[in-house]
Each structure stands twice: as C-alpha cells, then as structure tokens.
C-alpha cells in the first residue's frame, strides 16, 4: 500500500537542463506510482522570465516521453508554478515566498518543504542564508535542502560551505546528492554482503586479497574543458563517487539499516582511511593524461578544445587506499577512473585469496572473484574454481552470473527519482554526510597538493586503452592485477 507524501519542493535552477532531463521526469514517476497525489506542489525558480503557462509547457515537454495518458500528465502539471528570481537579491525572496505560500494553501500542504539547489555551487550558501533570513522555511513539518555536487573544491572550501549552510540548516537537514549512491547496483552491495552469510563471513582480510573499484569512460573531455581542466579525474570522480562506493565496501555491519547507523558505520571506515604524505602519494597513486589513439577522432587531451597547451591535468587516476582497521589489515583497495578508456564500465571486483589445498596436480587453484557491475548493465558475476574435464584432478575457473532483467530495469527507479523520494521520507542513508565528505576531501587534498606542485610523474596513455602501464605496475608491486581489462 503506497502512502501519500505531502510535500512542497522548490527547484532552484528550475529551467535548467538537469531539471528538464532528470528532475521533473523523476517527480512525475513518483506521481504515477501514487507517492504524490493531491497534496504536493512544485515551485520552479530561475532568472529566466517565464509565466506559469510557459513554465508548465516546459514541464509538459520534459515528461512527454514518459506517458501516453495526457489527462494524467495535465493533472500532474497543475501542481507546478513558477517565479523568476535572483538568488543574490534578498528582496526578490519575498516574491518566491509568496509563490510558495500560495502553492501550500492551494494544495493544503502544512510545512514539509524541500529546496533543491540545481545551481552553480557559489550560490549554495547565499540561497541557504536567504531562505532562513527572509522567512521561507516552514514553521511546521520539515525543511530539507538538496545539494548537487560539487560540495566544495577542497576541504577548506567545503568546510566554509558547510558552515554557511549550518547557519540555516542542521546537518541532518542537508541531503548532499551523489547520484551514484542512487544506482540500484550500488545499493545491492549491502544486500549482497549482509544478506548472504557466505559473503558476510568472508568479507575480511582472512579471505579477501584485494578490492577493486573501476569507473571508466570512453568519452574524452568533450565540451567540458573549462570545468574539467580544474578538476580532473581526481576531483570529478574519485573524491565523490568512488569514495562513496568504497564506503559501502569497507564499512562494518551497521547496528541497524537506518540512515543513522549506516552513516555511523561508513564514518568509522572513513575515519580509518590513511592520509598519504608526498612520498606515499608517489608510491600509491598514478596520474595520467590521454594521448592519441588509433582513430583520427581520438585527439590527445592537450589538443582538445579549450584545453591549455601546457595543462598538467589528470584525465586518469589509479591508486591504492589503505584502512587502519583489523578487518582490512594488509588488504589494498584499488581505485581507478579515467576518460577515453577502452570501455564504459562502473564495477566492483572483490578478489579472494587463492585456495591452498594441494590437489596433487600441476594446476593451482585460481583466485575467486566476485564482481558487481553497476554500469552500463546491472550484473553480478562470480568466478570460482571447479574440476576440469580432464582425467587428472586439475582445476579450472567457471563463471556464474546474473544480469538485471528487462522487467527489473523497467521497474527500477532512476537514481534521481530514488533520491528525491528518499529526501521526502527523510532517509539520508544514500546521501553523504559531512564527516564522509570532509574525510574524502582531506584524503584527496593530500594528493592534489603533490600534483599542483608538480611533484609526481604525469604519465600518458593511449586513447582506447585501459590507462598507463604504471597503473598495472601499481598492482603488480603487490602481486595483483586489474580484473577488468576493458
């Protein structure tokens, strides 16, 4: 039985690309499923001068591919309104406040306000300040703030932003969005581990040799050089998405599956993450930049549009994380992410130690591997040892697997739908809290400092490969190898 959610959501950046492609279709899916019925309202706001009818047409266009029921779509759109608004002008918040109160009265919503900031990060603190000072927060129910990444560009800027936000909101009212945490297969990590004693009992240093997290992209920088050349793979992918996935893998079993206990378990792991000095950065991390490929379409990074000719930016990062925890003593967590690689893939590979039993044959048992493939297909694969078909008692590897069915894909919420729904329910388990964000920044800042000072080699790798040779050597130093070859 679906329970109706009473809420009022204000989308800052309400005419933007993200709102049109992801946010409004996600809210519409919640409406179709019955979570939103009569008592909800959406207020869009941006600098663009639109009236309500023009804004409703924008919403209509954004959801047209998600329904054949025009009457249902029109009933949904009636819950939308719009006000043009300058987020830096305190006086203009009176206009927005009026729109919010009108919508609350019209749809009988008492409190329960969500503010979604799909705007440039430099406006986050300003908006939060004026939401409080100009009286836009509800006196009853809840007030929650959804924040798109990036949350700062360093620990210092993130801490400054956190301080600004906490002048208006408590940390438990802040929902920092990392859409990777909304992906079904990321959430499957916990179910697979804790729901199966066979894995839960072996999720430690006694059985696991190493853990690998890969986020590879086939595209280059495309038209994002202005942003990407200042961020690189380290800030764009490692600091947020990768670290949050690692949190699910490294944490202890939570006391319960509530957001409070899940965050506490993740934080205990993050707090045990070793922060590297300069020598350790060079030992445990590799940075690289893509060069040319076999195709003429594959330009080197330095020849891409708007990329400075002398750029030292990293388009590929590989590294080893270490946790000072009894569970993970001596177990490396390898991470890598890069552009212009051989295949698009987001995956986790858990490599188990090889068996030591002597079968009396020349063939040694291989390392078993549990793989969780997050993108582009959802799948779980298990590589095990079994007897070969030969007469001698030799072993061979066999593959077991499961792939998300088309029916399951159809019924799986998109990440933004899931995260908006979780925020409406006050469930923060799939959002990063300040402790997790701050530790990730401290870890990454130590690496960034070495790279900014140009005190680490900048490798080059061939476009269409899986990265530089140094990435393979990083693992080979421990007797390991990347599971995913591209």
From Swiss-Prot:
Please tell me, according to the UniProt entry, what happens when changing residue 22 to R: Decreases catalytic efficiency toward glucose 6-phosphate
Query: Which SUPFAM superfamilies does its entry note?
Result: Glyceraldehyde-3-phosphate dehydrogenase-like, C-terminal domain, NAD(P)-binding Rossmann-fold domains
The annotated pathway is: Carbohydrate degradation; pentose phosphate pathway; D-ribulose 5-phosphate from D-glucose 6-phosphate (oxidative stage): step 1/3
Which is a Gene Ontology cellular component entry for this protein? cytosol
Q: Where along the chain is NADP(+) bound?
A: 13-20, 47, 86-87, 149
Q: Which GO terms describe its molecular function?
A: glucose-6-phosphate dehydrogenase activity; NADP binding
The record lists the effect of residue 179 to N as:
Strongly decreases catalytic efficiency toward glucose 6-phosphate
Q: What Pfam families does the database record attribute to this sequence? A: G6PD_C, G6PD_N
- HAMAP family from the entry? G6PD
Concerning its family, UniProt says:
Belongs to the glucose-6-phosphate dehydrogenase family.
**What is the recorded name of this protein?**
Glucose-6-phosphate 1-dehydrogenase
Q: Which organism is this entry from?
A: Leuconostoc mesenteroides
């Amino acid at each position: 039985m679906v329970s109706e959610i009473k809420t009022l959501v204000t989308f800052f950046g309400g005419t933007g690309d993200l709102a049109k492609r992801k946010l409004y279709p996600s809210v519409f899916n919640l409406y179709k499923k019955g979570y939103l019925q009569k008592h909800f309202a959406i207020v869009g706001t941006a600098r663009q001068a639109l009236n309500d009818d023009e804004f409703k047409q924008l919403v209509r266009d954004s959801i047209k591919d998600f329904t054949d029921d025009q009457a249902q779509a029109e009933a949904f759109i009636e819950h939308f309104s719009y006000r043009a608004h300058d987020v830096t002008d305190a006086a203009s918040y009176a206009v927005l406040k009026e729109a919010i109160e009108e919508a609350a009265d019209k749809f009988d919503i008492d409190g329960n306000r969500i503010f979604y900031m799909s705007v440039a990060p430099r406006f986050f603190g300003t908006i939060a300040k004026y939401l409080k000072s100009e009286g836009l927060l509800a006196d009853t129910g809840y007030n929650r703030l959804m924040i798109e990444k990036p949350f700062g560009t360093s620990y210092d800027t993130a801490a400054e932003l956190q301080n600004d936000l906490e002048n208006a909101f408590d940390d438990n009212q802040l929902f920092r969005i990392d859409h990777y945490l909304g992906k079904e297969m990321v959430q499957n990590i916990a179910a697979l581990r804790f729901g199966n004693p066979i894995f839960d009992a072996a999720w430690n240093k006694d059985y696991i040799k190493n853990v690998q997290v890969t986020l590879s992209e086939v595209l280059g920088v495309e038209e994002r050089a202005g942003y990407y050349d200042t961020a690189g793979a380290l800030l764009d992918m490692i600091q947020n998405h990768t670290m949050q996935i690692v949190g699910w893998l490294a944490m202890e079993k939570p006391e319960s599956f509530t957001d409070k206990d899940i965050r506490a378990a993740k934080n205990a792991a993050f707090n045990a993450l070793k922060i590297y000095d300069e020598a350790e950065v060079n030992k445990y991390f590799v940075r690289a930049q893509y060069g040319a490929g076999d195709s003429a379409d594959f330009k080197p990074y330095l020849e891409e549009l708007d990329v400075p000719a002398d750029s030292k930016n990293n388009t590929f990062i590989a590294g080893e994380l270490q946790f000072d925890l009894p569970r993970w003593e001596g177990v490396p967590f390898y991470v890598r992410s890069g552009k212009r690689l051989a295949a698009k893939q987001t995956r986790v590979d858990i490599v188990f130690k090889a068996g030591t039993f002597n079968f009396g044959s020349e063939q040694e048992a291989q390392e078993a591997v549990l793989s969780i493939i997050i993108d582009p297909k959802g799948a779980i694969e298990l590589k095990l040892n079994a007897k070969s078909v030969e007469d001698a008692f030799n072993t061979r590897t066999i593959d077991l697997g499961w792939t998300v069915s088309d029916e399951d894909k159809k019924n799986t919420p998109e990440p933004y739908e899931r995260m908006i729904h979780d925020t409406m329910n006050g469930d923060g388990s799939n959002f990063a809290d300040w402790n997790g964000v701050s530790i990730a920044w401290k870890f990454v800042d130590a690496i960034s400092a070495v790279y900014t000072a140009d005190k680490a080699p900048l490798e080059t790798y061939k476009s269409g490969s899986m990265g530089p040779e140094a990435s393979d050597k990083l693992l080979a130093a421990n007797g390991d190898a990347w599971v995913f070859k591209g």
